[in-house]
C-alpha cells in the first residue's frame, strides 16, 4: 500500500487542486482523503472522471459528494462528533462544570462509536470483509488502549506496513 500526502493550503477546491488529483488518479490512486472543508470538490471532480473514490471530512459528506459527482463515490467520512461534542459541552454548562478559556483535545470517551468525539460516517461503504461490527470492535480496542493512535503533529509518523510519499504543498 502506498499513501501520498499533499497539503492543499486552502479550504476550497480549484483548478490547480483538481489537476493534482487528476494526476494522482491517472497514476493509480484509488481513494483520496479530501481533508479540508470544501476541498472535496476537487477530489470529487477528479474521481468522477475515472471511477475513483473519495473520503470526506468533518461531517458525513456522502450526500454532498455523491450528489455532486455520482452515487457511490464517497467511501466514508472522517467525522468530528459534533452532536456528541455539543451535547457534552451543554451538559457541562447546565451542570455548572463547564471550564471556559481552555483548549481541549477530544477523542474517544467510550466503546460506543456514536458517543465519541471522532467517528466515521453512518454511510460508510464497508468492504473487503470489514464490517460495521469490526469497526465497533476496533473502537472498543482503541478505547481500552489495546490499539493506540498517535496525535503528534511535530513529526511524520514512523510506518512499517505502508510507504508514505510526502509531496509538500500544492499552493
Q: For each of these PLM feature ranges, what is it?
A:
Residues 1-171:
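A residue-level marker of the well-folded mature domains of exported/periplasmic proteins
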Amino acid at each position: 500500500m502506498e499513501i501520498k500526502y499533499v497539503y492543499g493550503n486552502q479550504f476550497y477546491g480549484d483548478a490547480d487542486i483538481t489537476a493534482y488529483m487528476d494526476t494522482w488518479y491517472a497514476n493509480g490512486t484509488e481513494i483520496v482523503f479530501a481533508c479540508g472543508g470544501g476541498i472535496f470538490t476537487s477530489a470529487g471532480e477528479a474521481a468522477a472522471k475515472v471511477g475513483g473514490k473519495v473520503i470526506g471530512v468533518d461531517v458525513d459528506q456522502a450526500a454532498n459528494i455523491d450528489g455532486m459527482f455520482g452515487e457511490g463515490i464517497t467511501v466514508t467520512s472522517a467525522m468530528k462528533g459534533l452532536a456528541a461534542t455539543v451535547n457534552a459541552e451543554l451538559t457541562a454548562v447546565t451542570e455548572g462544570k463547564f471550564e471556559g478559556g481552555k483548549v481541549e483535545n477530544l477523542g474517544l470517551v467510550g466503546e460506543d462509536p456514536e458517543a465519541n468525539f471522532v467517528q466515521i460516517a453512518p454511510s460508510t461503504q464497508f468492504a473487503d470483509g470489514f464490517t460495521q461490527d469490526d469497526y465497533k470492535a476496533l473502537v472498543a480496542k482503541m478505547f481500552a488502549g489495546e490499539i493506540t493512535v498517535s496525535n503528534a503533529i511535530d513529526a511524520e509518523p514512523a510506518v512499517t506496513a505502508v510507504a508514505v510519499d510526502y509531496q509538500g504543498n500544492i499552493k
